[in-house]
């Protein structure tokens, strides 16, 4: 293991100078998939020998409530700078920042990198580095459409509406995006940008960002279970897991299922909450009354996964956006469940090697065919899923290699002369 040069504790700070300090940053402590990965990364890095981890999220700064503070959160930038100065990290891993933290933190990271000599990394959960809309969507008559990667950097990408809030707002969004990109080039702020999918890496490369490494997000289900069997059954229980909002495509999937008279679908169970839940409960009242759609609400993970295993024969990922690396596909496989996946964006390729994906498009015949394939898949008692690359220990090892931590620490010279360097 790499030996740190200084073995004393700095009296003025109370910091353990023998340990490599890693600051892990994210917009929110808890909300969605990115937050789960944020917490997992902090936990897994903290288990590496000689590594000390500190978290920074919305529990330590005020989230902006105005357009200005959401675009440039000065309070968040100040809080992050105070944390960096006090903690004196050797490594900084930034997950999502474009929502609550805002681009204001980029100036802090750039400035403190010059002063302290730490290395900074970013896990790109969303598409904010490559397009004006972080979901990689544009709007055609208010209808969301996934932007093809071939359009990145072209005139078409510039002219498409990236928001539904009007022309002026769209133009201001694009001007702001380009200004931030010019002032804080991602390749200069971050040593390496971690991509949870090959699709994200391709998007970054097409946008001129090439300092990337693909690292699959770790499953929240620690142990793979035996794949479930539904041999002889003709109708199946399908689970949706996630945020109930427009871009997740749940309403469209329910309508599509209704258009094929719930072909092979016994019931759709919805795990999660979100801004569209009440409207959807009103919209699908008759289906709820008939028991074809059930809303279970949001559950903690320790309750969610066992209940999914008991309830579902398969999960559905009907997202309208490009997504990136939807963990639910992998978590379903860990629970022994196949996944019906909308064929678009990163979802078209994420987890292909796992063996539990069945793709469908937004047409009735495509869904019917996918459900017939699901029946055959579930009837296969000998099926196995390949999950080694999604296990937490694999994720931990890959991060340690990229960030040069613990036994993976390198010997590259550092500009830090005030204390131990990992």
Question: Whereabouts are the PLM-identified features?
Answer:
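A conserved mid-protein helix/loop that constitutes part of the nucleotide-sugar donor-binding site
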Residues: 35-40, 236, 240-259, 275-278
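Conserved acidic donor-binding segment of nucleotide-sugar-dependent glycosyltransferases
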Residues: 354-365, 372-377
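Membrane-proximal helix-turn-helix segments that form the acceptor-binding/catalytic region
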Residues: 128, 139-192, 202
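Acidic donor-binding loop of glycosyltransferase active sites
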Residues: 309-324
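A charged, aromatic-enriched C-terminal amphipathic alpha-helix characteristic of glycosyltransferases
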Residues: 376-413
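Acidic anion/phosphate-binding donor-loop and adjacent secondary structure
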Residues: 7-9, 205-206, 210-236, 408
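Nucleotide-activated donor-binding/catalytic signature segment of Leloir-type glycosyltransferases, i.e.
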Residues: 281-299
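Short hydrophobic beta-strand element within catalytic cores of glycosyltransferases
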Residues: 314, 338-341
């Amino acid at each position: 293991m790499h030996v740190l040069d200084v073995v004393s504790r700095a009296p003025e700070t109370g910091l353990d100078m023998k340990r490599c300090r890693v600051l892990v940053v994210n917009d929110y402590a808890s909300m969605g998939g990115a937050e789960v990965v944020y917490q997992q990364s902090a936990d897994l890095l903290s288990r590496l020998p000689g590594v000390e981890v500190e978290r920074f999220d919305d529990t330590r700064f005020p989230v902006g409530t105005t357009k200005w503070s959401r675009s440039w959160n000065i309070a968040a930038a100040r809080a992050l700078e105070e944390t960096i100065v006090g903690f004196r990290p050797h490594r900084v891993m930034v997950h999502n920042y474009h929502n609550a933290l805002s681009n204001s933190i980029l100036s802090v990271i750039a400035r403190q990198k010059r002063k302290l000599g730490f290395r900074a990394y970013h896990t790109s959960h969303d598409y904010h580095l490559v397009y004006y809309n972080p979901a990689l969507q544009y709007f055609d008559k208010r209808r969301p459409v996934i932007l093809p990667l071939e359009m990145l950097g072209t005139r078409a990408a510039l002219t498409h509406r990236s928001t539904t809030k009007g022309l002026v707002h769209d133009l201001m969004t694009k001007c702001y995006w380009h200004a931030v990109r010019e002032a804080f080039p991602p390749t200069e702020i971050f040593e390496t940008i971690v991509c949870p999918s090959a699709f994200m890496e391709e998007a970054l490369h097409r946008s001129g960002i090439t300092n990337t490494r693909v690292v699959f997000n770790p499953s929240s289900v620690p142990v793979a279970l035996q794949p479930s069997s539904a041999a002889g059954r003709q109708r199946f229980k399908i689970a949706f897991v996630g945020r109930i909002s427009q871009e997740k495509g749940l309403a469209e999937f329910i309508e599509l299922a209704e258009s094929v008279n719930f072909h092979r679908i016994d019931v759709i169970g919805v795990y999660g909450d979100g801004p569209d839940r009440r409207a959807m409960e009103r919209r699908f009242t008759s289906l709820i009354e008939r028991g074809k759609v059930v809303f279970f609400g949001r559950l903690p993970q320790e309750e969610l996964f066992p209940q999914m295993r008991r309830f579902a024969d398969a999960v559905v990922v009907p997202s309208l956006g490009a997504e990136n690396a939807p963990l639910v596909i992998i978590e379903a496989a860990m629970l022994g469940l196949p996944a019906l996946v909308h064929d678009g964006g990163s979802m078209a390729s994420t987890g292909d090697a796992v063996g539990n994906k069945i793709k469908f498009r937004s047409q009735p015949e495509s869904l019917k065919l996918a459900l017939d394939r699901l029946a055959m898949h579930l009837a296969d008692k000998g099926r196995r899923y390949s999950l080694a690359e999604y296990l937490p220990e694999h994720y931990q090892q890959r991060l340690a290699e990229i960030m040069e931590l613990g036994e993976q620490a390198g010997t590259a010279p550092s500009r830090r002369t005030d204390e131990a360097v990992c």
